[in-house]
UniProtKB/Swiss-Prot annotation:
Residues 108-227 form the BAH domain. Belongs to the class I-like SAM-binding methyltransferase superfamily. C5-methyltransferase family. One of its GO terms (biological process) is zygote asymmetric cytokinesis in embryo sac. The gene is CMT3. Coiled coil: none annotated. Keywords: Chromatin regulator, DNA-binding, Methyltransferase, Nucleus, S-adenosyl-L-methionine, Transcription, Transcription regulation, Transferase, Ubl conjugation. GO terms for cellular component: nucleus. Changing G724E: In cmt3-4; loss of activity. This is DNA (cytosine-5)-methyltransferase CMT3. It comes from Arabidopsis thaliana (Mouse-ear cress). Changing R683K: Loss of activity. Changing L542F: Loss of activity. Ubiquitinated by JMJ24, subsequently beingargeted to proteasomal degradation thus initiating the destabilization of the heterochromatic state of endogenous silenced loci.
Length: 839
């Protein structure tokens, strides 16, 4: 069966409360005495009554046709999460007539499209709504229909309302009908454009009760900028949101949008890959964007793992790859901008602050200062030929932390290049200026406003389910989770058009989703539009389940990207926090869409050559032809997969990294004892029996079987793992299965990773195929490091699907409010058609 797809929310004018669990919503209308509306006599007070004559019947029936149809029971129109008992049947209240004005408690007059407080439970803040309908029911009761605003604390960010301005609320599409007497107080809510400059405050917001610049849609917890036409429609029917400064703000946003569209016309974009690993996420994003017609290029990448950086640089020689921490990278970006300002390449209102930056005073005769350095040991004088690099941190762990320049010395080659602190090169201003100007022109480092897309998955060891020592109470205090703060700080500094963050689904589970809520709140604080969802790798053409959390961000001038719907059938597994279950990207249950069959292990790796436990070669040749569409596609070289027409016959299809972790002699002997059949594991070893409750134990009275080394065949850790209930230790995979999740380790001690027919664990290449890496994607480092690179990666087909959605949004091709996007038929194995000049 296919997983369920959630329907987008639509208008619902029933008596049903807001359908999303645990989110603040008005209560059902209270029961009132069933009596017709009477004329108010002098001295008599009623809780609520309508004013003026009713709206003409023809106009009312045209505006609210459902109110005048015969009474019938039908399912609700709006749905955002899984159905509850209250969703089964809802009766639409039939109207006798509609009104434009009402008075409550003989003191407060309300008109259509007014904003108001609505009574809530005792001791709780009142609800906030826009009145979109007022009518007398056929039963004689008085009603109004509310379209609800959400306070920040009522949204997915919850406690991180502290990051949001106090008066800010979010407009939803959720509507329901309540008794008129529940109206409590009239409000002044300003509908304003979402401003990219978070430091700029529109003066009119100081005198209002609340202001609203974003919609909040429950499906996929989407925060989207209010469109200008929406504000105009509201202002036409209301006296609010008409201040001159608000209109000017809207015009400013419009100008930004037009400028963005001119840039988009070139269909080119730059990408920064943070925590890049070996580059899977950016590789997939660029592949998918290209299929949408956008030429997305990974211009910069950062990771602290040297082996991963080498892998990325080899496969993407066009990328500026930096092996450094994200913290140091942020410091470097700030110092680079200062240098650009100092050399008048970039404007700044405080440019005078950088006049003597690092001792590089802007004096003309500074060029006469010697650019030489004397070696104290032998008296040799070195002359700076040119500056060839820049870095921040502690190069080779030898010097103090700071900004360093890489120097090429006159009459020496690059093997003698050295890193020198910039303060020691203050007499080389001319050389530094030359380097900075060349670097600025070529874009060796991104500058604020100069990046189109930032992607990355901040390290998740502190929240991963594979980490048994997680800080459950305050995850942001865990040093392993601090990178989430750094990631958001880099986004805030660079202000890219689009942001895509990836992480494990445990981000939603641990501490009630604390870190995920923080990430959403932080992006909203920066005035990014936001959408989050979960995607399973197997639903996009892999023999691996691998569910991951993704968070989109987009500037107000852009369209927030959608999530791509699955291309392959897949049965979902695992437990998801109830509140986020509806955020899984999937089709509705019972849908009629024809999805491709799910891929199995045999579809993915059956064509690979047999290798032994001791195999160490980095390159080998194929000995079989591919037999499945996946195998044919994954073998394509980069030039073939990119749609290039210039196929070099001299290039051969090479298979990289098809060698397994070389197991020690004891583990190898154990693997050889695992039967070659489905479901086999250590429980098949001699002397192991399964007792009550599926708990394993050793057979009593029998001597334990020993290995050649003298150690026991059945290790104690296998008997005690998960209290003896696990079947994972030394588990053998089978051809008709899918892998739950490719991880960073290859030891078979507590996972099912043994090859179906060979006495070894899955090779690095087999794991890489399960992640969707092309066969020609070469990895670097020791075997364990290669497994880590593959296990930490975002599945390439998932990133490819997201790249297509990104490209569609970037080019302004996304239409409608649906948070989900249908991919083209055959997308999984689709190759782009390049223009002739690029082919």
């Amino acid at each position: 069966m296919a997983p369920k797809r959630k329907r987008p929310a639509t208008k619902d004018d029933t008596t049903k409360s807001i359908p999303k669990p645990k989110k603040r919503a008005p209560k059902r209308a209270k029961t009132v005495k069933e009596e017709p509306v009477t004329v108010v006599e002098e001295g008599e007070k009623h809780v609520a009554r309508f004013l003026d004559e009713p709206i003409p019947e023809s106009e009312a029936k045209s505006t609210w046709p459902d109110r005048y149809k015969p009474i019938e029971v039908q399912p609700p129109k709006a749905s955002s999460r899984k159905k509850t008992k209250d969703d089964e049947k809802v009766e639409i209240i039939r109207a006798r007539c509609h009104y434009r004005r009402a008075i409550v408690d003989e003191r407060q007059i309300y008109e259509l499209n007014d904003d108001a407080y609505v009574q809530s439970g005792e001791g709780k803040d009142p609800f906030i709504c826009k009145i979109i309908e007022m009518f007398e029911g056929a039963n004689g009761k008085l009603y109004f229909t509310a379209r609800w605003f959400y306070r920040p604390s009522d949204t997915v960010m919850k406690e991180f309302e502290i990051l949001i301005k106090k008066k800010r609320v979010f407009f939803s599409e959720i509507q329901d009908t309540n008794e008129l007497g529940l109206l409590e107080k009239k409000l002044n809510i300003l509908m304003i454009p979402l401003n990219e400059n978070t430091k700029e405050t529109i003066p009119a917001t100081e005198n209002c009760d609340f202001f609203c610049d974003m919609n909040y849609f429950l499906p996929y917890d989407t925060f989207e900028a209010i469109q200008q036409e929406t504000m105009m429609a509201i202002s036409e029917s209301s006296t609010i949101s008409s201040d001159t400064d608000i209109r000017e703000g809207a015009a400013a946003i419009s100008e930004i949008g037009e400028c963005s569209q001119e840039t988009e016309g070139h269909k080119k974009a730059t990408l920064l890959d943070l925590y890049s690993g070996c580059g899977a996420m950016s590789t997939g994003l660029c592949m998918g964007a290209q299929l949408s017609g956008l030429n997305l290029v990974t211009k910069w990448a950062v990771d602290m793992n040297a082996h991963a950086c080498k892998s990325l640089q080899h496969n993407h020689p066009e990328t500026n790859v930096r092996n450094m921490t994200a913290e140091d990278f942020l410091f470097l970006l700030k110092e680079w901008e200062k240098l650009c300002i100092h050399f008048s390449l970039r404007n700044s209102p405080n440019s005078e602050e950088y006049a003597n930056l690092h001792g590089l005073n802007n004096v003309e005769d500074n060029e006469d200062v010697s650019e030489e350095s004397e070696n104290e040991d032998d008296g040799e004088v070195f002359t700076v030929d040119k500056i060839v690099g820049i870095s921040f941190g502690v190069p080779k762990k030898l010097l103090k932390r700071g900004l360093y320049l890489k120097v090429r010395w006159l009459n020496y080659d690059d093997s003698h290049d050295t890193w020198e602190p910039i303060e020691g090169l203050s007499n080389c201003r001319g050389k530094i200026e030359e380097f900075v100007k060349l670097g600025y022109k070529s874009g060796i480092l991104p500058l604020p406003g100069g990046v189109d897309v930032v992607c990355g998955g901040p390290p998740c060891q502190g929240i991963s389910g594979h980490n048994r020592f997680r800080n459950l109470l305050d995850p942001l205090e865990d040093q392993k989770n601090k990178q989430l703060l750094v990631y958001m700080n880099i986004v805030e500094y660079l202000k890219p058009k689009f942001v895509l963050m990836e992480n494990v689904v445990d981000m939603l589970k641990m501490a009630k989703g604390y870190l995920a809520r923080f990430a959403v709140g932080r992006l909203l604080q920066m005035n990014y539009q936001v959408r989050n969802g979960m995607m399973a790798a197997g639903a996009y053409g892999l023999a691996q389940f691998r569910l991951r959390f993704f968070l989109w961000g987009a500037l107000p001038s852009e369209i927030i990207p959608q999530f791509p719907l699955p291309t392959h059938d897949l049965v979902h597994r695992g437990n998801i926090v109830k509140e986020f279950q509806g955020n899984i990207v999937a089709y509705d249950e019972g849908h009629t869409v024809k999805l491709a069959d799910k891929l199995l292990l045999k579809d993915v790796i059956s064509d690979l050559p047999a290798v032994a436990n001791s195999e160490k070669r980095d390159e080998i040749t194929y000995d079989k032809d591919p037999t499945t569409p996946f195998q044919k596609f994954i073998r394509l070289r980069k030039d073939e997969a990119s749609g290039s027409q210039s196929k070099s016959k001299s290039k051969k299809h090479v298979l990289y990294d098809h060698h397994p972790l070389n197991l020690n002699i004891n583990d190898y002997e154990r693997v050889c004892q695992v039967p070659k059949r489905k479901g086999a594991n250590f429980r098949d070893f001699p002397g192991v029996i399964v007792g009550p409750g599926n708990v394993v134990k050793l057979e009593e009275g029998k001597e334990r079987v020993k290995l050649e080394s003298g150690k026991t065949l059945v290790p104690d850790y296998a008997l005690t793992y998960v209290d003896g209930k696990s079947c994972k230790p030394f588990g053998r995979l089978w051809w008709d299965e899918i892998v739950p999740t490719v991880v960073t380790r290859a030891e078979p001690h507590n996972q099912v990773i043994i090859h179906p027919e060979q006495n070894r664990v899955l090779s690095i290449r087999e794991n890489a195929r399960l992640q969707g890496f092309p066969d020609d994607y070469k990895l670097f480092g020791p075997p364990k490091q290669k497994y880590i690179q593959v296990g930490n990666a975002v599945a390439v087909p998932v990133a490819k699907a997201l790249g297509y959605a990104l490209g569609t949004a970037f080019q302004g091709l996304a239409v409608g409010k649906d948070p989900l996007l249908t991919l083209p038929e055959g997308f999984a194995f689709m190759k782009p058609t390049l223009p002739s000049e690029l082919a």
